[in-house]
Amino acid sequence: MENYQQTQEQKPSGSPNINIKFDNNKEAITQQDKAKQFNKQFVNVVKHATKKSNRKIDKTTKALTATPMKITNIQTYEAIKNTINKDSTGPDNLNIRHLKHLGPIAIQYLTDTLNLALSTNCIPQIWKLAKIIPIPKPNKDPNLGTSYRPISLLSPIAKTMEKVLIPHITSNITPVRYQHGFKTQHSTSTALHHLTNQITTGFNQKQPADRTIVVSLDLSKAFDTVNIHNLIQKLQQTNVTNLIKKFVANYIKGRKGYTLYQGAQSKQQQFKTGVPQGGVLSPTLFKLYTSDLPAPPQNVSITTYADDMNPSASHANYRIAQNNLQPYLEDIFKWTQKNELILNPDKSTATLFTPHQAEFNTILDLTINNTIIPTVKTPKILGLTLDPHLTFKDHVNKTKEKADKNIKILKALNGTTWGKQKQTLIATYKATVQSGQS
């Protein structure tokens, strides 16, 4: 989540001389006030009774009998080595590069620290603190607070601990068949292959062939709205060791964050919901949180990647496919309500994939909580723009347009003295043209 070029405190995260209006109609003028309002926006995503929730978590884990477990020097070293280098620092003013310079003796001390925190369940407060940097969203009004997204920076030592624990958690969670996120030998590519294969298989049926309806569901700020007590209850039902259950429960409750904006720093506030922003363990915890998503009924499928959920149905008559899909959408909505996730029908989309040109302009009649889901012809799912006939023309054209624009930048660089260096051009190509095609 971090990007050094974006998150250096010395570099501006927006124009310093503009007033910013926030959702509470508060217009922030000073840098200090902007930092304060940003922190409220990023930390207080959902309002819950934090103290009551924390007491529930304590009660849930208090009776657990923990079996001792030891983290080894090799596990600590491998966790550090396999972390991508970042220059941005956490709230402890450390980054992963600092840890990569540790020698054997220092690694031993660090491992002892991790083991002490795990065995005693005493977690340093700095491990539960997030430093948040507001980053302007592209092509958005910089005068609105909602036009900024948070980059959350954590202690690299805390993230090392998270990384050490991940294998112990994932190996004890039953994998969900249709979940492609954060799963061995699965990725966005396998998710997209599963979805597009369903569509093309339908097209290849004997006439009149199968149409496929795909709904792309929008979960608003899904990672940030997770109910922590509900998450711990789901963790309790797994085969994860009690020692790790107790540690994770303590680690994710009572977390705090502060925001830095243009050199101004807000006060710390407590996160009331959500898995740790910027944490490497968070995707695994979210996968656990959504593991009890209702299974699709017969004639309906679903493909998920983290919080991207795409239920679908195929049939020679699109109206029958639509009727098959509607009850499942209602089941998913009820599940999101129970789990306190926010399903937004207005930002969700429904698309009819059909081999028949006459049906390209069909408006579907699917709803979530009695709200019509917008019908779109070219949805963007997991970075891939699809079209009703699955020709990928829209995706290819948009990718080519973006690549052409970046190639012009390369040509301009090649005309400068310093830009003629081969390595400079290759690095720029990978960062612009190649990355835009992945």
Model-derived regions: residue spans:
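Basic/polar low-complexity segments
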Residues: 1-73
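Short, conserved secondary-structure transition motifs
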Residues: 6-12, 188, 254-258, 351-360
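Conserved pre-catalytic core of RNA-dependent polymerases
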Residues: 42, 68-276
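Short, conserved micro-motifs composed of acidic
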Residues: 66, 263-264, 327, 342-377
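Catalytic palm active-site di-aspartate
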Residues: 90, 129-132, 149, 179, ...
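Catalytic palm subdomain of template-directed nucleic-acid polymerases
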Residues: 100, 219-238, 310-333, 391
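Active-site palm subdomain of RNA-directed nucleic acid polymerases
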Residues: 165-180, 204-207, 283-313
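Basic, alpha-helical interaction scaffolds
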Residues: 298, 371-438
